[in-house]
């Protein structure tokens, strides 16, 4: 058992201002309580939303900020009331580390929609301390907000699944799109998009990758196993694909028109938005008279557990580039340029942090 109310320090890499440049930062972890796990971080993925946060693109950033919400680690200590985990377990945690536990979303295992949820970084915990993310040596997380990483799934492979994997898996299940034989589109072939191809194919779907240019065609068809490739600027190709898809996953994290992709949907088809965009959506209303624009935000811890088991059963892994922490600023610059196939993962435990 762990010692209750024990405060420790750790070193992470933090942004100090909207330049988004990260550098070593030593800080106090929040007190570890009876329901908490004290975790050594092994690996942490880099998500495009980390860039939005460290650069204050959403106008809500507080500094110093240690980013990282695709975290896999090893349990070093457990609180006296922890029942599901023990020292030595390999666990994952994501972007939500607190909720009210009493609202409708919390009571229906959808805690990520709780209005009082606490983000794993760039937020304030119940004790008044700022939350900090997984680009750090250690973290403290409540038992409710971690999941066991299945044996046989490497830590660096599991990390992106904590965000990118469940972001795709959750809406397919939630919106009744899990059955085989469906035809789906994946708009954008990045960290989330490439997992979209893999998970949809594993569910038995016919998958079309939609991209702004032809340069990812070989990757999509030969390496990821997509069935078709569509260039959004190809008017003839887009016209031929009209009314052909049951759903389109829109993973693009910047402002873009929606009408071209609504036109690809069958009647009652769904355009599922997962990219973080800091601007109002614009579309012509007749385009959605018999289709739907909807969205999805990561997944609950229960859905994350289901997704990990699904990936284990199907042998799915993310395609990653593993880096050390001293390369993280270069990696963030490359990510902004879409120069990664398909997710950076920081080898935190193998990095010099101070």
Curated annotation (Swiss-Prot):
Gene Ontology BP annotations: lignin biosynthetic process
Cofactor note: Binds 2 Zn(2+) ions per subunit.
EC number(s) stated in the UniProt entry for this protein: 1.1.1.195
Enzyme class at the top of the EC tree: oxidoreductase
Domain of life according to the entry: Eukaryota
Catalysis: reaction(s): (E)-cinnamyl alcohol + NADP(+) = (E)-cinnamaldehyde + NADPH + H(+); (E)-coniferol + NADP(+) = (E)-coniferaldehyde + NADPH + H(+); (E)-sinapyl alcohol + NADP(+) = (E)-sinapaldehyde + NADPH + H(+); (E)-4-coumaroyl alcohol + NADP(+) = (E)-4-coumaraldehyde + NADPH + H(+)
Required co-factors: Zn(2+)
Key words of the record: Lignin biosynthesis, Metal-binding, NADP, Oxidoreductase, Zinc
InterPro entries the record matches: ADH-like_C (IPR013149), ADH-like_N (IPR013154), ADH_Zn_CS (IPR002328), CAD-like (IPR047109), GroES-like_sf (IPR011032), NAD(P)-bd_dom_sf (IPR036291), PKS_ER (IPR020843)
Pfam families the UniProt entry points to: ADH_N, ADH_zinc_N
Binding-site list for Zn(2+) 1: 47, 69-70, 163
Entry binding sites for Zn(2+) 2: 100, 103, 106, 114
Regions that span the bilayer: none
GO MF annotation, one: coniferyl-alcohol dehydrogenase activity
Binding-site list for NADP(+): 49, 167, 188-193, 211-216, 251, 275, 296-298
Pathway assignment: Aromatic compound metabolism; phenylpropanoid biosynthesis
Protein family per UniProt: Belongs to the zinc-containing alcohol dehydrogenase family.
Subunit structure: Homodimer.
Function: Involved in lignin biosynthesis. Catalyzes the final step specific for the production of lignin monomers. Catalyzes the NADPH-dependent reduction of coniferaldehyde, 5-hydroxyconiferaldehyde, sinapaldehyde, 4-coumaraldehyde and caffeyl aldehyde to their respective alcohols.
Name assigned to this protein: Probable cinnamyl alcohol dehydrogenase 1
Organism for this UniProt entry: Eucalyptus gunnii (Cider gum)
């Amino acid at each position: 058992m762990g010692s209750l109310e024990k405060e420790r320090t750790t070193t992470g890499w933090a942004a100090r201002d909207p330049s988004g440049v990260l550098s070593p930062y030593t800080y106090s972890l929040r007190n570890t309580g009876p329901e908490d796990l004290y975790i050594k971080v092994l690996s942490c993925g880099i998500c495009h939303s980390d860039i939005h946060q460290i650069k204050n693109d959403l106008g809500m950033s507080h500094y110093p900020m240690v980013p990282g919400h695709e975290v896999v680690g090893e349990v070093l200590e457990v609180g006296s009331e922890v029942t599901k985990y023990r020292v030595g377990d390999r666990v994952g945690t994501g972007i939500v580390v607190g909720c009210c536990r009493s609202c409708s979303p919390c009571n229906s295992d959808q805690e990520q929609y709780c209005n009082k949820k606490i983000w794993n970084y760039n937020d304030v915990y119940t004790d008044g301390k700022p939350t900090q993310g997984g680009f750090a040596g250690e973290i403290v997380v409540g038992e409710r907000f971690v999941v066991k990483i299945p044996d046989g799934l490497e830590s660096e492979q599991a990390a992106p699944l904590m965000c990118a994997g469940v972001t795709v898996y959750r809406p397919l299940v939630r919106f009744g799109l899990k059955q085989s034989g469906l035809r789906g589109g994946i708009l954008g072939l990045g960290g989330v998009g490439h997992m979209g191809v893999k998970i949809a194919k594993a569910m038995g779907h016919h998958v079309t990758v939609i991209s702004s240019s032809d340069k990812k065609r070989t990757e999509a068809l030969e390496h990821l196993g997509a069935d078709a490739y569509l260039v959004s600027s190809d008017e003839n190709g887009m016209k031929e694909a009209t009314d052909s898809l049951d759903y389109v996953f829109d993973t693009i994290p910047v402002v873009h028109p929606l009408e071209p992709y609504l036109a690809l949907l069958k009647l009652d088809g769904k355009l599922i938005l997962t990219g973080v965009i800091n601007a109002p959506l614009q579309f012509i209303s007749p385009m959605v008279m018999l289709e739907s624009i909807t969205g999805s935000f990561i997944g609950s811890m229960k859905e994350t557990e289901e997704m990990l088991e699904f990936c284990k059963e199907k042998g799915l892994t993310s395609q990653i580039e593993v880096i050390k922490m001293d390369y993280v600023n270069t990696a963030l610059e490359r990510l902004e340029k879409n120069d990664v196939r398909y997710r950076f993962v920081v080898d935190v435990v193998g990095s010099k942090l101070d």
